[in-house]
Amino acid sequence: MIINDPVTLAEVERVFARYEAALLINDTEALAKLFWESDKTIRYGVNDHQHSAGEIAAFRALGPSTDPARELKHTVMTTFGTEFATASTMFESPSQPGRLGRQMQTWAKIDGAWKVVAAHVSVIEAP
């Protein structure tokens, strides 16, 4: 198995950037397209959790859940072969001084398109 094949890594970096851009403006349609349309898709948020693409879409419809001024740091993408990847990042937001956010996503290439199949977000006191 090839780890971080350059072509695959570039694909994942691009789709992650699209996800981040959609998240910051709460583009719910774009976000929904980036998640696997399945009842097996899971998202664990800071104060919430969803166990299907439908539940995730309903959560997103409630309104923005992210500070649009958040700043990513220590972002790491790792690909395994050509159809599986993880994206891990930390973030800081002016609206939450002294707090450090952590976000992890599992991506799979399904029917030729990269989709988030599992995601987890948490926030801790900054060390």
Role assignments for model-derived ranges:
Residues 51, 94-97, 124-127:
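A short local loop/turn or secondary-structure capping micro-motif enriched for an aromatic residue
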Residues 42-44:
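Polytopic transmembrane helical bundles with strong interfacial aromatic enrichment
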Residues 1-38, 49, 126-127:
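Short, low-complexity N-terminal intrinsically disordered segments enriched in polar/charged residues
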Residues 86, 100-127:
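Short beta-strand edge/turn micro-motifs at domain boundaries
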Residues 37, 80-81, 110:
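Structural motif
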Residues 35-36, 91-93, 120-123:
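Short beta-strand segments enriched in hydrophobic/aromatic residues
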Residues 11, 46, 54-99:
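Surface-exposed, charged secondary-structure patches
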Residues 19, 31-32, 55-56, 87, ...:
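Hydrophobic pocket/interface hotspot
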